[in-house]
Amino acid sequence: MVVEADKKELICSFCSKKQHEVKKLIAGPAVFICDECIDLCTDIMKEESRVALKQITSSIPTPQKICAILNDYVVGQDQAKKILAVAVYNHYKRLEYVQSGNNDVELNKSNILLIGPTGSGKTLLAQTLAKILDVPFTMADATSLTEAGYVGEDVENILLRLLIAAEFNIAKAQKGIIYIDEVDKIARKSENPSITRDVSGEGVQQALLKIMEGTVASVPPQGGRKHPQQDFVQLDTSNILFICGGAFMGVDSIITSRTNHSSIGFAANVNIDKEKNNSEILKSLEIEDLTKFGLIPEFIGRLPIVTTLDELDKEALITILTKPKNAIVKQYKKQFELDDTELVIENSALEAIAEKALAKKTGARGLRSILEHLLLDSMYKVAELKKQRVTITKEVVNGLVEPIMTSLISTKSNKKQSMIEDIPA
């Protein structure tokens, strides 16, 4: 119902000022709002954004401190950690600079591309960074994305997940981190533009361009396709940090082909790179290699910071099993402790587990599934037996014998008996 003064002059529905007392009176469905109330709302929203940013920037650790914390959770990848630490630190310092209003020099956003084999720690690095900075974080799988209007997930749904992670606090969400995995799977299907529409490859890259660069996106709070009549949330993506990751299988061949091309001739050694491993080859990565792989130049341009991760060797996998704060072996030991059971994994068994993961080419990601398979029967039994010791040996890992289960009670009584026998008469 429209509010009127003296049945003639319209008034603001919020502050009740008459039309002649304000500069503008904007009409909505059965309500009016004046320019002064709009300014007040804008100031409130800006203040909320400033407070949210201050909470983040006031607690930003230095790049060296970020690296030190990453070392507690992620094994190896020292160069990637250093690059990420500097990039993230500079990103949030840039936000502080922009918020201060001192814009004599424009600082552009620098999104990040992580390239490395499966299980090398790309996702874990992004997750750990978000924990360190205490900012909203969400992950998306690029393979599930399609262009708007096609069967699949819209890119705006990524922003919806970030909003949910921020508990629908728009100011906090606008300072969050989004990790998009498997970006190598949205590479253009061929190097030449196709006459048919590539809705899950180049089409997704095109759809991601705007939100990665910075735009005010309309985000459907209930998901876009099932509720077309809903009100949209406006989310500014200018200050959201995008980290993309992928294995980029085959890009090493592109790099090798490029680096060997200049040496082709009668005396050329075309197999010069055969002795190099993938990690060494990836260090020679150039932008043109990514273009040839299938990423469009505009998409690569939105990811100015590119870093490669090393393939994990046997020693690194053993370290991952035991050393980090949330090491997998520590987690399983704690799980068994909850059932009054001691878990013992011999060093030779750890080596055998690492060798299995290397053989499967799953990297660190495969370690948990190997351990889960080894310990399944033991976890099934100890919940009822209690007071047990479960020992995993190399033979257990190789499937030659079952996990060795002994009673802790009998072990303690045997020790006590031997101590009594050792006492001289």
UniProtKB/Swiss-Prot annotation:
Record GO biological process: cell division; proteolysis involved in protein catabolic process
Residues at which Zn(2+) binds: 12, 15, 34, 37
Signal sequence extent: none
GO cellular component: HslUV protease complex
Keywords assigned: ATP-binding, Chaperone, Metal-binding, Nucleotide-binding, Zinc
Source species, domain of life: Bacteria
CDD domains, per database record: RecA-like_ClpX (cd19497)
InterPro entries referenced in this protein's UniProt entry, alphabetically: AAA+_ATPase, ATP-dep_Clp_protease_ClpX, ATPase_AAA_core, Clp_ATPase_C, Clp_protease_ATP-bd_su_ClpX, ClpX_bact, P-loop_NTPase, Znf_CppX_C4
A GO MF label: ATP-dependent protein folding chaperone
Binding site for ATP: 117-124
Record domain ClpX-type ZB: where: 1-53
Protein name, UniProt field: ATP-dependent Clp protease ATP-binding subunit ClpX
